[in-house]
């Protein structure tokens, strides 16, 4: 029987093989996802259900078409300059990354194209396979004028090192696939039409291993990231909320 959560979330298409490989594909109406307030609301809840399902031995995250995630509908996030609304965003934002890491199964990212919105989702994976045309960036935060404090700052600092991460955040640097591989952001770069197949092949190899080994190994390897995210997102998202409120104040003052 197909679990009910497979079809519960409008921006997530899910399917699972008999060997326990769950593929989670981001989309909007069957095309590349446009990240919205609804997606922000749904993700922590979907990830909790995925993590609770012990039939998921390996999880693959991927996008649709030529993009992983490259567009965001800022207006759909609501009036996040209001404390009550930001509290909701704060709760959801912190738990997305926590719950990704709390899935007790190997997480493989198949980055099928540019990841300039929430690229931290794929960089949190245990194994990241990228298309040769993939690009990693943080388009929304600096573009909107708000602090990148939702955890993306932690992930890039862990993977790039402190100085490179600060440069990345402040300059809106775009890191192309081959450079990302050299810097250690991704594990493999493959032709575009081979991304999912390569991720699936790795997943099939892992799915043959004992499930307790898979669960407990991923648990052991993620402890540092969990600690860093817990520390970094508390202050980071508070500062992000302050800058969101300031943007609204500046707009009101200029009106």
Give residue ranges: language-model regions.
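C-terminal alpha-helix plus adjacent terminal tail
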Residues: 1-22, 28, 65-69, 75-76, ...
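Ligand-binding pocket scaffold of soluble enzyme catalytic domains
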Residues: 5-15, 21, 30-31, 39-44, ...
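Structural motif
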Residues: 21-25, 60-62, 108-110, 129
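Terminal peptide-recognition signature
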Residues: 24, 43, 61, 106, ...
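A short, well-ordered alpha-helical element
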Residues: 35-57
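Catalytic-core regions built around general acid/base machinery
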Residues: 46, 92-104
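Glycine- (often His-adjacent) and acidic-residue-rich active-site loop
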Residues: 55, 62-95
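Crotonase-fold acyl-CoA enzyme core
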Residues: 99-211
């Amino acid at each position: 029987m197909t679990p009910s959560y497979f079809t519960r979330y409008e921006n997530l298409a899910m399917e699972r093989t008999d060997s326990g490989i769950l593929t989670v594909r981001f989309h909007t109406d069957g095309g590349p996802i446009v990240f919205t307030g609804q997606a922000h609301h749904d993700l922590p809840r979907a990830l909790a259900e995925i993590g609770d399902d012990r039939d998921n031995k390996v999880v693959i995250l991927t996008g649709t078409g030529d993009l992983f995630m490259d567009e965001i509908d800022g207006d759909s996030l609501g009036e996040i300059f209001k404390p009550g609304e930001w509290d909701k965003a704060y709760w959801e934002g912190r738990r997305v990354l926590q719950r990704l890491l709390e899935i007790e199964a190997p997480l493989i990212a198949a980055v099928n194209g540019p990841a300039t919105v929430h690229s931290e989702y794929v960089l949190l994976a245990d194994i990241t396979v990228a298309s040769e045309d993939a690009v990693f960036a943080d388009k929304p935060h600096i573009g909107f004028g708000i602090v990148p404090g939702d955890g993306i700052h932690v992930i890039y600092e862990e993977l790039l090192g402190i100085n490179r991460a600060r440069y990345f955040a402040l300059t809106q640097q775009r890191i192309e696939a081959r450079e990302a591989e050299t810097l250690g952001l991704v594990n493999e770069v493959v032709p575009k039409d081979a991304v999912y197949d390569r991720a699936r092949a790795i997943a099939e190899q892992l799915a043959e291993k004992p499930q307790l080994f898979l669960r407990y190994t991923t648990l052991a390897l993620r402890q540092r990231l969990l600690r860093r995210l817990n520390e970094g997102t508390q202050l980071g998202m508070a500062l992000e909320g302050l800058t969101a409120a300031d943007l609204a104040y500046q707009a009101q003052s200029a009106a």
